Amino acid sequence: MKKQFLEKAVFTVAATAATVVLGNKMADADTYTLQEGDSFFSVAQRYHMDAYELASMNGKDITSLILPGQTLTVNGSAAPDNQAAAPTDTTQATTETNDANANTYPVGQCTWGVKAVATWAGDWWGNGGDWASSASAQGYTVGNTPAVGSIMCWTDGGYGHVAYVTAVGEDGKVQVLESNYKDQQWVDNYRGWFDPNNSGTPGSVSYIYPN
């Protein structure tokens, strides 16, 4: 099945002040083969790493698409299978991203997550359920066909939800980056491939396309 992928989304992250000694890190480097459901955040948590550093070590950024079977270079010790990995400090990273993009939405919310990736999104579009109408009022095209780089909106008459489309399959299934999915308040690909019209997220689905 042919699929359309977004190889790299524009995602600005504030530069860290610390100097990383790559030589020492590569000397201790190991590899990890990605499993179904893995993400930069889950692998980084497993190896007590920072997700943004992990992506950079592998020549990618945090929004790059990774798939089961691919190998990532890692460092650090993996947590035992019967022991939960120590949480990484994602709060600092997401806060820096918010500052870098002048993100006007509450940190951790779905609107914040999409604005962090799709910086062209409006600053004051309201809750996720308001985004389609707000974008249309500002001259953006809103439609019913998924497209890589578009913003997916679930409008349910309440808060709604939004996500950023990174891949579209010929069967209509999509992959997205989103925040606040099942209360997980950082940007990630939580669902893999899914049918946007049968996703378990309530509301009618529409898409905002960048101008």
UniProtKB/Swiss-Prot annotation:
Domain Peptidase C51: start-end pairs: 85-209
A GO molecular function held by the record: hydrolase activity
Domain LysM: 30-74
Transmembrane segments: none
Keywords (A to Z) from UniProt: Hydrolase, Signal
Signal sequence annotation: 1-29
Stretch list, region Disordered: 77-101
Record keyword GTP-binding present: no
Name of the protein: Putative hydrolase SMU_367
Species annotation: Streptococcus mutans serotype c (strain ATCC 700610 / UA159)
